[in-house]
Structures are given as structure tokens and as C-alpha cells.
């Protein structure tokens, strides 16, 4: 969406393509970790299982490197292309987008390495499951990770020219609009190096704060409790979303369900018809007394009505 927003539709499709490999790799790798921890999903209850899950560790490392845009992996080619294209718009909006893109890439690297380090490094923190009960996943689960890791490493390099290279017009065949003055512009070296440098720096920074010196974060919790709670609750976006969208949708749905579905459709439709048929069948059942003289009397009344009709006509 970032790339499409700055008009880099071909880059957006390229990132969607590379993103599929390393994001799927991370999702399936997370599943392998959850399997090892017997369905535990909180990374605060993990840690120190690098040697217990060696293959999952390697695949998650590859996926994390690719996601953060580490140089020469798939994410590096597509992520940098997005930021570069925003910079080349040569406008205030383009510069703003490029700045936000660089900051986002750095923060993405921080939280990605936080996930990786707290899962595999540091001390083991699960009190319910002994570390000797954690185990590597079977080959049937690891095989897809292997193939996805190949794409996470090489897909960006081998398909860059096809999607966004100088001859990419031949691939898109006019289906995507290109700004030629942007496509053939140059980018200063410092800008090209800025994002990769920040991505690489995020590795020791994350390890320092989340593994080596966790007391810094503990101190931050104590001294900045309101801010910490605000961040811990994800800016209360979920609660705000509930108030603005979920709860009103529930009320509207409940109204139409009770007044429309139950109050009208069911009342005059299936439920109403079935009740009417049941009532008529109960009335008809009153004539079935089981006594011969009642049936003979009914036949006599019917015969009298029939004869009267014939005589009158």
C-alpha cells in the first residue's frame, strides 16, 4: 500500500511477491515454535531454545533477515525500491513518505529482532513446560520452511529485473503505468546506504535492550508507567475499534435480527405458516373421535348438503 500510494505500482507488486516468501516462512516458523512449546504463543514464556530447535532457528533467522530488509536478501530489494521511489518523487509528500518509510523499516527491524531474540536467546522462561520437553518439529513441518527460505533468500535478486528493472515494461506489457522521469533518475549514495545501515544497527540494539540489559526496560516500566501501559495496550486501538465499529455493528445487527428476522420474516414466514398449519390440523383432529355414529352423522350431513346442491341446480 505504501508503494501504491506513491505511484510505484510495479514495486508494490514486486514487494508483494517477495513478501509472500519470507512472511509465510515466519508464519510457519512461528507454528513450529508453538508446536515445540505445546501451543504456547506468548514469547515472554519462551527463550533459550536455539539448540533445541536448530532447524527452526535457522529458518526463522532467514525469515527475520529478509523481513527486515537485510542486504541482498529478498526483502532488501523490494523494501529499498519502495523507499527510493518515494524519494525520487522529489516533492514534500514524497520526502515525507520516504522519511516515514525509513523510520518504519527501522522499527520493523527492532520488533522483528525482539521476537527472534526473546524466542530463541536469553534464559528459558516457561514455568509450565520443562525445557527438555521442547523439541524440533518433524520433517513434514520443516520441509515447507526449507523451500520458503530459498525464496526468501534468492527471489528478490533473481526477479528484480523482471519486476522493476530497465526492461520491466516487457514483463508488464502496458498493464502498469510508469513515470519515466522517475524511473531513470539517480539517487545519492548516502540515501542508498541509510536504510541498510539502520537495519544492521537494529540487530545489536535489539539484543542489547531485550537480552543483555533487560533491567533498562524494567526501569522504564516503573518510571513511565502510564506510557508503558499505553504502549502495552497497543495505543488502545482495539478498544477504540470496539467502540467505533464493533459495538455499533452488534447493536444494528441485533436490531435487524429481533425486529426484522424474528419479528417479521419468521413471524409471517416459516414460523407463522407452520403455526397456522398446526392449528388447522388440530381443528381437523377434533372430527376424528373414533366413534362410528359420529362418522355416520358427518356422512349424513354431507349427503344432505350434496343433495340440496343438486336439487337447487
Residue ranges and their predicted role:
Residues 27-30, 39, 70, 79-80, ...:
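Alpha-helical transmembrane segments of polytopic integral membrane proteins
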Residues 19, 46, 75, 116, ...:
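Divalent metal-coordination and catalytic microenvironments
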Residues 1-88:
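Hydrophobic, small-residue-rich alpha-helical packing segments that form membrane-like cores
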Residues 23, 27, 95-133, 169, ...:
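Predominantly late transmembrane helices and immediately cytosolic-facing juxtamembrane segments
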Residues 165-197, 208-313:
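Aromatic-capped, Gly/Pro-kinked transmembrane alpha-helices
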Residues 70-83, 87, 157-178:
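Membrane-helix interface motif
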